[in-house]
Amino acid sequence: MSRYEVDGVDIQTLPKVSLHDHLDGGLRPQTILELGDEIGLELPASDAASLGAWFAAQSNSGSLPEYLKTFDITTAVMQTEHGLHRVAKEFVLDLAEDGVIYGEIRWAPEQHLQRGLTLDAAVEAVQAGVEEAIGLVASHGGRIRIGQLVSAMRHLDRADEIAQLALRHRDRGAVGFDIAGPEDGFPASRLQSAFDTLAKAHFPATVHAGEGAGIDSIADALYSARALRLGHGTRIAEDIVVEEETDEAIVVRLGQLAEWVKDRQITLEVSPSSNLQTGTIAQWGTALTDHPVDLLHQLGFCVTVNPDNRLQSGTTLTRELGLLVEAFEWDLDDLEQVTQNAAAGAFCSFDEYEELADEIADGFDDLR
């Protein structure tokens, strides 16, 4: 049993959907030690507990660029077919253990070519690990559905190539495209031709926006990338003015961009703990209770809750939901709403969505 409960229900037992979860941010510390030993990688700690603590400490810098430096270690042990296969398999098994029934794994294949893998071989290795894990979950009476989000690094110049990679694997595990890396100064419009290619092929994209940069970045992601979801999207709150707040009600005025995102129900992939670590919510405060996620949720935005990087944040989706229950007194209805939001935003077929939505509703009803 987890320590996180809502209305007397263990949150870990609830069906969950994870949309924003980085493969190179979800390694088990013991796996890093073992894979690192195989390649002679020098690590900052020699046991799993200490290594996990090191990642958490390094990630609490309040700076997105500093936070991203921790990935130098995780990607170093993910440069072979064996390493990628193992990491992907364990990643999915850990999701299933946490109650996730549908998950999308985002990762950037271009960061995993240092030991001779091709882009396609890297994607195939991850897919093989995913499929092995799905089979293991099924053999124990469970079920989990997983898709790959193939990411391009926004500050590099391979987006067109990575977009074509995603399209080659659209029927072999890839369900969507993403751009990641430093957001500020690297708008989606830099990669316009890649997004044009994807749009012409009717392939969905989510874009990291509203994390390391503000509403101009969000607007650009929606316009240039035709983003169906916003990775984090937290800083859309910069376009909301609170005009009056009492114990009974809150009166706000939405700017045109915020109104568009709300009215079109564009999915916000909010990652609360990560947002604290990277300073995303610094303008509102430094505690989780300062995070605009509750305001966005109460106003009817399509909020979803995600772990982002389970290793760096020392977290799980259960924990992220539990923290919001503690901070904002969310109840089962709130958790079901954000979970259904995630199902609606998932890059799957409409038939798969309907099945997923029913499974979520039944799962919550059974625990009420």
Where are these regions (language model features)?
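Metal-cofactor-binding active-site regions of metalloenzymes
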Residues: 1-203, 211-229, 235-368
